[in-house]
C-alpha cells in the first residue's frame, strides 16, 4: 500500500519495469562509492524494508492522474483486503450520471469477483518481491557519493556502476540511470528518488525500439500522519519509439492528497463509502 517495496516498482516505461531485477543477478561491488554514502544508503534501505514489513496502516486519499490520454481524479480507499478507487472527475469535469453508474457497476463487479481480487493480490505480491530484490542491489548497481546536506535532509548522488553486469533488458535500463536520493536525517526515511536516463536504450539493437536519453522520473514521499510515510507524488517522463510507427515510454504525473486513515476494513465497506461519496 504505497510502502517502500512498491516505490521503485512504480516506474514502468514502454511496458518495461524500469527497475526490475532477477533474483540471481551477479553484480560487483561499486568500488567507486563513498563509504559514508554507502553507510547512509544501507541504513535508509534497512529502515524502509523493516517499515514495509511491519506497517499495516490503511489510508484513504484523493488521487490526480495525468497522462497524454486523460486527466483523471479518483477517490481511493485502502482496506486490509485490498484497495478500491472510484473515478470522480475526468478531464476537468465531474462524471455524468451515466458514467457514474458505470463506475458503480465496475466497483461492485470487482468486489463480487474473488478471482479478480486474487489476481490483484498475486500481482501485488509479485511486484513486492521484485522490488525487494532490487532494493538489496542498490549499492551494487550504482556508484554512490554524498551530495548536499541541510539540517533535516541528506542528498546522495548516484550514477551507473560500470562493473554492474545487467542480465536482461530491464536491469540494463536501470544501469544507465543517474540521479539523487534524498533522505530524512532524523528518521532515515527516503523522501525523494529521482533520476534520468544518461544514454539511449536500444531494444533489439535498435531494430525493435529505443528509449530516449534524458527521460526522467521523480518519486516523492512524505509523512502523512502518525509517523507513516507514503508515496505522495510520482512523475515519469520517458519517451521513445518502437519499430517505426509506435511511440513507447511513459508520460505520467500522479499526485495523492487529502490523506486520512481508512475506516474501511473490507472491500464491501470501502464500496459503501465510495458510493456514499459519489
Give the ranges of each region predicted by the language model.
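N-terminal secretory signal peptides that target proteins for export/translocation
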Residues: 1-7
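Bacterial N-terminal signal peptides
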Residues: 10-20
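N-terminal signal peptide c-region/cleavage motif recognized by signal peptidases
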Residues: 22-25
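Structured extracytoplasmic
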Residues: 27-177, 186-191, 196-214, 220-225, ...
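Beta-strand elements of repeat-based all-beta scaffolds
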Residues: 220, 231-233
Amino acid at each position: 500500500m504505497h510502502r517502500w517495496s512498491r516505490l521503485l516498482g512504480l516506474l514502468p516505461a514502454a511496458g518495461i519495469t524500469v527497475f526490475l531485477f532477477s533474483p540471481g543477478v551477479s553484480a560487483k561491488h561499486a568500488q567507486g562509492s563513498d563509504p559514508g554514502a554507502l553507510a547512509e544508503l544501507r541504513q535508509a534501505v534497512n529502515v524502509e524494508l523493516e517499515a514495509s514489513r511491519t506497517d499495516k496502516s490503511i489510508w484513504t486519499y484523493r488521487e490526480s492522474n495525468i497522462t497524454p490520454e486523460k486527466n483523471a481524479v479518483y477517490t481511493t480507499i485502502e482496506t486490509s483486503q485490498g484497495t478500491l478507487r472510484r473515478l470522480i472527475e475526468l478531464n476537468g469535469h465531474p462524471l455524468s450520471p451515466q458514467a457514474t453508474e458505470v463506475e458503480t457497476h465496475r466497483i461492485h463487479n470487482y468486489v463480487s469477483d474473488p478471482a479478480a481480487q486474487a489476481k490483484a493480490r498475486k500481482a501485488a505480491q509479485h511486484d513486492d518481491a521484485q522490488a525487494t530484490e532490487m532494493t538489496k542491489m542498490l549499492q551494487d548497481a550504482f556508484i554512490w557519493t554524498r551530495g548536499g546536506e541541510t539540517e533535516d535532509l541528506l542528498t546522495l548522488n548516484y550514477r551507473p556502476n560500470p562493473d554492474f553486469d545487467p542480465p536482461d533488458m530491464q536491469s540494463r535500463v536501470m544501469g544507465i540511470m543517474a540521479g539523487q536520493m534524498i533522505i530524512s536525517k532524523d528518521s532515515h526515511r527516503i523522501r525523494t528518488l529521482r533520476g534520468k536516463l544518461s544514454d539511449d536504450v536500444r531494444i533489439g539493437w535498435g531494430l525493435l525500439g529505443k528509449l530516449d536519453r534524458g527521460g526522467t522520473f521523480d518519486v516523492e514521499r512524505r509523512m502523512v500522519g502518525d509517523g507513516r510515510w507514503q508515496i505522495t507524488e510520482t512523475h515519469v517522463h520517458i519517451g521513445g519509439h518502437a519499430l517505426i510507427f509506435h511511440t513507447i515510454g511513459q508520460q505520467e504525473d500522479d499526485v495523492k492528497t487529502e490523506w486520512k486513515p481508512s475506516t474501511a476494513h473490507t472491500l464491501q465497506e470501502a464500496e459503501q463509502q465510495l458510493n456514499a461519496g459519489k
